[in-house]
Amino acid sequence: MAKPISKKGSRKNVRIGSRKHTRKIPKGVIHVQASFNNTIVTVTDVRGRVISWSSAGTCGFKGTRRGTPFAAQTAAGNAIRTVSDQGMQRAEVMIKGPGLGRDAALRAIRRSGILLNFIRDVTPMPHNGCRSPKKRRV
């Protein structure tokens, strides 16, 4: 039986183009969202386009360990490592949420070597808006 002839330029074998377009980003914004269950770190450029992101869950932490300060530190380190390779030198930090990972993520960002222009707390606070849910009785 004859062998099937393979096409020279089949789409499976040839990669069309680079999937991620790497560009030099000198300045960016680091968003840290720290809840009690997880910490999400997103790095954007000045216009708000996402460059890199990481969370405690994607770093391999499961369950209640995602809300720990060490998990937040690891997530921040992973998100910043990719953008520092792209040449980011200055950043602004926006921290949102009441979680345990706020300070640990900020410590990891400071240690990364990126110069911080300012650190802003953007946690949403109601001006007596909607009624809050009832307190848990444990």
Curated annotation (Swiss-Prot):
GO terms for molecular function: rRNA binding; structural constituent of ribosome. GO terms for biological process: translation. InterPro entries: Ribosomal_uS11, Ribosomal_uS11_bac-type, Ribosomal_uS11_CS, Ribosomal_uS11_sf. It comes from the Eukaryota. The keyword Coiled coil does not apply. Signal peptide: none annotated. Pfam families: Ribosomal_S11. The keyword Ribosomal protein applies. It is found in: Plastid, Chloroplast. One of its GO terms (cellular component) is ribosome. Residues 1-22 are annotated as: Disordered. Keywords: Chloroplast, Plastid, Ribonucleoprotein, Ribosomal protein, RNA-binding, rRNA-binding. SUPFAM superfamilies: Translational machinery components. Belongs to the universal ribosomal protein uS11 family. HAMAP family: Ribosomal_uS11. Part of the 30S ribosomal subunit. This is Small ribosomal subunit protein uS11c. It comes from Glycine max (Soybean). The lineage of its organism: Eukaryota, Viridiplantae, Streptophyta, Embryophyta, Tracheophyta. The gene is rps11.
